[in-house]
Regions:
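Basic, Lys/Arg-enriched alpha-helical interface segments
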Residues: 1-72, 82-90, 98-117
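Short, charged interaction patches at domain edges and termini
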Residues: 78
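Conserved catalytic cores of phosphodiester-cleaving nucleases, focusing on short active-site segments
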Residues: 94
Length: 117
């Protein structure tokens, strides 16, 4: 179900940090297609499945989840105008990475927190 406001606009606006833009520019085209699909879901779906977006425990951050074959990509998100991403109208994509292990999360969360400051 795609939900837009009465004028047909997206539910959420997405903003991109320089770090995310740099990461995205280096992706292969088939990976970019999956990223675009997931970003469209965030823009237009009111309720977001944990298949695509998940809250990071003990943080005010979320992760966008993109799977391409056996590769798992993650992008750290920040809901700008509400603590809950579902109620947020503005979402900032902070930094993206190819998930290799759970150790990656600690490093990437620190990078995301630095970007927010």
């Amino acid at each position: 179900m795609k939900a837009t406001d009465k004028k047909g606009n997206d539910i959420r606006e997405l903003y991109f940090s320089d770090e995310f833009v740099e990461f995205y520019s280096m992706l292969q085209d088939k990976v970019k297609v999956k990223f675009e699909h997931t970003m469209d879901i965030i823009r237009t779906e009111y309720v977001l499945s944990t298949k695509f977006v998940k809250h990071l425990e003990n943080k005010n951050l979320y992760e966008m989840r993109v799977s391409v074959n056996t590769n798992e990509y993650r992008t750290i998100l920040f809901a700008v105008d509400n603590d809950n991403i579902i109620l947020s109208k503005k979402v900032l994509l902070l930094n993206g990475f190819l998930k290799k292990s759970t150790k990656d999360y600690c490093k990437q969360i620190k990078i995301a927190e630095r970007i927010l400051k």
